[in-house]
Amino acid sequence: MDKKAIKTFAIQARRSLIESIKLKLENLGITKDGVAEKMSQSTNEIEYYGDKGLSITGQDIRRRRELVARLKGMAKQEEWSDALTDLIEEVAYTWFNRIIAIRFMEVNEYLPSGVRVLSSETKLKVPDILREAFEIEDDLGGYSVDEHGIIQKALDTEDPTDMDAAYVILFTKQANALNHYLPELFEKTDDFMQLLFTPSYSSGVIKDLVDDIKEDDFDVDEGGQVEIIGWLYQYYNTEPKDAAFKKKKYLSSDIPAVTQLFTPDWIVKYLVENSLGRYWIRVLHDRGDERTSLQIAQSFNWQYFMPEAKQDEISTRADLSKKRVEEITFVDPAMGSGHILIYAFDVLLQLYQSEGYSRREAAQNIVERNLFGLDIDRRAFQLTYFAMMMKLRRENRRSFELQLHPNVFEVPSTSLELKDFSGAKDGSPIDSGNLSDVLGRFGAGKELGSLITFESSIFDDKLINKIVSEREAGQLTFEMSDQVNHQWELRNLIRVGKALSSQYTISVTNPPYMGSGKMPKTLAKFVGKYYPASKSDLFAVFMERLQHLTKENGIFAMITQHQWMFLSSFKALRERMSSWPIINMAHLGTRAFEEIGGEVVQTTAFVVQKQKLQGFIGTYERLVDFDSQKKKQQAFLTAVQNPNLNYVYRTKQTNFEKIPGSPIAYWASKKKLELLQYSSYRLQNILSAREGMTTGNNALFMRSWHEVQFFKISFLSTAHQIERDKTWFPYNKGGAFRKWYGNIWYVINWKNHGEAIQSNIDKKTGRIRSHNYNGKFGFREAITWSAISSGMFSARYSPTGFLFDSKGVSSFANDHTTLLFCLAFLNSNSSSSFLELLSPTMDFKIGQVLNLPLAKQHSPQVVELTESLISSSREDWNSFENSWSFTTNILLTNIAEHHRNWTVEAAFQQWQKEADDRFNQLKANEEELNRIFIDLYGLQDELSPEEEDKDVSVRRANLPRDIKAFISYFIGCVFGRYSIDTPGLAYAGGDWDASKYKTFIPNKDDLILLTDDDYFGDDRDVMTRFKEFLTTTFGSENLNENLKFIADALGKRGDSSEEQIRAYLRDDFFKKDHLSTYQKRPIYWEFNSGRNGGFKALMYLHRYDRNTVAMIRTKYLHPLQEAYERKLVQLKKFEENEQQTRQKNKYKKQITTITKELDELIKYDEKLQHVANLHIDLDLDDGVLVNHAKAQADTKILTPLK
């Protein structure tokens, strides 16, 4: 199955259908602005609408009125524009579903007429339904005289226009005729829908489907599956889902799109075979079948069945020897497009056949007795219904005549109330209360779906049964005619309610995933009240619901996100789950779904017996380290054949209780369990930890340190003495994986002890928005770590002087030595192995970290090694300019001893050796620490001290990165931020000190041009300055060699080294490197005239003043404009005099380029003049984002910070 082609088709089909429908609506005078009146020239026979004055006649006039009435009715419940959008979506998906269904039926020869509708069996361009229109007239319900004439004319002339007209009639009749056989999918077409869709076999969705999706993907005899319907549906929803995901909170209408995820085929098989299949194996064993469970599974070809672990003595299970296959009920309460139910159908068919049933009889029983499903999404319900009917049709050619209705349901919403039923007044208070309860629970059915619960006895209520049976008995007593509709609606509610109140032998689902923060209000309130243990996410709520839906001694199976296994917010749910034994779990981790990349969705599939079995040993397949869906699948299949592999674990659930928080850490060794359970000495005995501050508005109170003026930052504050004249204070805020030292990016406004932060009031609530100031812990030396990580845990030493954030947890000890010992342990692989059990979700809570067992011996060697590791990590961090302790570029560290007569390549090789030495020494020291702690904890059989290079935090040399850092340092020197003569920052706000610059003098103006050529030959040109800088630092003798080395490292195109470096500075320096180095808070801003690049230049933020833009216009833009004009004149002369065509064309191309640049400069000059006249002042305390926007005054004169 070519899923890429399927996805492309489905997405494009939706777009095409929607655009076509919008256009037809506009032609009918219906737009987002409302409904247009018919034009004055209209008559009773013909009406004109829209800007184009298009006409409609006959039945189309009536259809338009129905359409308008439908829209106005919808608009009573929502805004007009929303009603119009919803109707467009409804019409689009209605026709999409029908087209897909017809395609599946025609390929598999399931259409009652036996004639293809969308294509030709003999590969003709014209569909067979046109060629055989009169042969199948009875199948399509007959033709009117007019229809007969149109079809006959088309067959006679074969004119494309006539053929199209006939095809519209035939296609629509076929869709309506299928209503008799498949009423839930092919509902009787509302007449207005025919106005909004014109089927065509020669272009559009139908043609694309036939041409682009392989026929074999639909053909069940050629390996095709009805599951293709599910894939098409998921991909059809791609764009609505992407749009909904961007919302902070979902609407009820978003729920289907954001929660639909088609389950991979092998996971469906795993879930069904290990629940339904396992249950039947128990039946056979109780009947006396002596084969092993694996042998029985293999006899059915259940490849994904995993036998149970060998058990100690456990509680007796219920006897299933008398269980008949007809009695097994199977439910999917979040069925989507029916993937799980369809495979359950296949398995049940095997079971029936093994019991002696014919396939035909078995299929009818399965549909009528065994399978049940529910969903809130009508489209998904229709597709599941269709898929079930197709499975039935495959086994029984006469199934359409049986008028069977599979037990799959759309959970509806209703606005009905007790007062809508006249018969309700005759009921007792209890009966009336029951009816009111039923109606009330379905009030938000479209949001709550299968989460709605009932006591089954409620449907024995006399009043309810009286109302729903009255029509059948011919005793219609309604006082109002529309109460007939109410009765039918109530009957549907009762059918769905009975399905929701029932319990089932087997319950299996892939539930919707939705965090509580994004739930619509009604849903969030409901789960908070009725599912408090699992309210954090919808998937967890369904875990509880599945337990309730499953009969005692039954089995339920799911695939969910794996957070419930570990997070403290799901501890109550884990306690509830502990009542039932986990028979098997395939812990999938990331990338279990090929449609979802990255580390976001981590999943686990599991099978649970709803029977209390003391001491049950579950089997767990740890597939998290296999990095693709296919590899996980293969690893599981391998484990079935060889269950003794090192990623297959067996353990009792009672073992989880030995671990703090009781996570489902099935891979915990006996030794670690003992340490976690019995250790009396833990980190919490010697460390105090605090979750840090929440400012309430980081955008207002927090900055990257380089954004503000350096002299305003406090570096000397302690817990006992705070620098009162400073505004900004160092602030720990977690960050990426890094051990020992670093991730020092931020400062926070703590002026006057955080006066601004502590007085920031939420206007809505009247409360202070910030909290957790941790006053007595502020500015103390600490261990800090990132609360959330995308990888391993890493802790860092934080010297005195820092405040800390909620995402940068800090912990404190009574003395320096103890702090370093704890830091050493936290960064050891022993600690990591414990944290994998306590916090596998990479969300490192304080309680989990402080619960780590701690060895009592405080080795002096550990402290000595830790001091060395911190020192090495600090040296590495300070080697680059994103550190405020940066002194000089790594390639210039040793130039003095070479008397500035060296090559850049030699300098790089020296740095490379230093970096490698530091890397290797740090790695060796970390491995020595690992060895010490492994010995202290007795984990020699489980861990080895060796460390992978990727887990070493310090950096090795990297030629492209380090050359770019050198160029960045050069830019800093040009602007005076750095000086060759002054270590560290020379200027970052405050008073300019010219004495700091002797060897290389910064530009007088706060600008350096980034042009494609040297137009001035002075310090306005970036390459002129760069060559001067290279000559100053490395000597003139090596200039060309150094330029070539740098150019080669950058890898840009160009005819010379200078051209390559110039191209990098002009095209890549700002957008590709500076923005990322400074985390989208750049200190150098790029002036940019637009797409043609007529004017590009860098400015240093800290040197900006209110006259900078005016200076740029007069001293740089205008002279550059004149230079362009001179060059243009010169090029035109060259072009006129040139005889060779190739060179002449080259000149023409250059003339076109520079002409575009000049035109762009003229427009840009207007923008600059506007901004210059405003004389805008910036306050660096406001931060880069605010100032970057402010400096442009609603124009676009700077490159965006993207």
From Swiss-Prot:
**Any idea which UniProt keywords this protein has?**
Antiviral defense, Methyltransferase, S-adenosyl-L-methionine, Transferase
| E.C. designation(s) | 2.1.1.72
Which SUPFAM superfamilies does this UniProt record tie to the protein? S-adenosyl-L-methionine-dependent methyltransferases
What Pfam families does the entry give?
Answer: Eco57I
Molecular function GO labels: site-specific DNA-methyltransferase (adenine-specific) activity
Q: Give the disruption phenotype, in one or two sentences.
A: Loss of whole genome N(6)-adenine methylation in the fifth position of the hexamer 5'-ACRCAG-3', no visible growth phenotype. Has a higher plasmid acquisition ability (when plasmids have the methylation hexamer) but a reduced ability to retain plasmids.
Q: Which residues form a coiled coil?
A: none
- Catalysed reactions, semicolon-separated: a 2'-deoxyadenosine in DNA + S-adenosyl-L-methionine = an N(6)-methyl-2'-deoxyadenosine in DNA + S-adenosyl-L-homocysteine + H(+)
BP term (GO), one: DNA modification
Q: Which PANTHER family match?
A: DNA METHYLTRANSFERASE A (PTHR33841:SF1), DNA METHYLTRANSFERASE YEEA-RELATED (PTHR33841)
> Which family is it part of?
Belongs to the methyltransferase superfamily. PglX adenine methyltransferase family.
NCBIfam families reported in the protein's UniProt record: BREX_1_MTaseX
Q: What does this protein do?
A: BREX systems (bacteriophage exclusion) provide immunity against bacteriophage. Part of a type 1 BREX system which protects against dsDNA phage. This system allows phage adsorption but prevents phage DNA replication, without degradation of the phage DNA. Methylation of bacterial DNA by this protein guides self/non-self discrimination. Probably methylates the adenine in the fifth position of the hexamer 5'-ACRCAG-3' in genomic DNA. N(6)-methylated adenine on the fifth position of 5'-ACRCAG-3' is found in the genome; there are 1906 sites in the genomic DNA.
Q: What name does this protein carry?
A: Adenine-specific methyltransferase PglX
Q: Which organism is it from?
A: Lacticaseibacillus casei (strain Zhang) (Lactobacillus casei)
